[in-house]
Amino acid sequence: MHEQERDVAKKWKRYNVQLAIIGIENQTAVEKKMPFRLIGYDGASYKSQLQANAASIAPVVTIVLYFGEKHWCKERNIKSLMNIPKELDPYVNDYKMEVFEIAWLTDEQLEMFKSDFKVVARFFVNKRRDPDYVADDPTEIQHVDEVLKLLSVMTGDRDYEKVICDEMKGQVKSMCDVAERLKNIGRQEGRSEERINAVKFAISLGASEEKILKQYSKEEYEKALALMKA
């Protein structure tokens, strides 16, 4: 797909024969004109198959995974988004998009998943039910990096990326471990902020750099200076 970029594109094959192209779009917010964007992606997929002189054209299926806490409230087909003269309506092809509201899945639907996505979906369901929810899912995660990156993007919380970079990342096996690492990172950042504030206070009292560096690092001193000048 050269003309447009999808979030995820997969080829569905059986016995080495391509049966379909599956496109997946991840959304955290409702987008009014989403059906038009998807028909553009699908059109680009068909065009690329034509340009490749494929012996047969594989069908293209695009689904939207919506992670928002409110129901998708906008139209899901392009005809609903246009003012079409009734004389032309029979000749205008419609396009309907499939939206899966992840945060609104039932417990029975969650149990249907067998991959790491079950952990991700359950997290968003619980977050929607309780905004103060702290991850407590003991299910072992097979692909920790991928799950944490997805959570970081879909929640807008960069702390999940910090867990990926943390030297203790290897000990993270479940969302329970993730919650514990986030708690520790929060403590460390809190202590770091306290130390920076202490350096700023010492500078404001006129303490010399030499004296401050006896108790604090050069990095802490320079960061405190930069914050005071900002």
Describe every region a protein language model picked out.
Residues 1-230:
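Elongated, amphipathic alpha-helical interaction scaffolds
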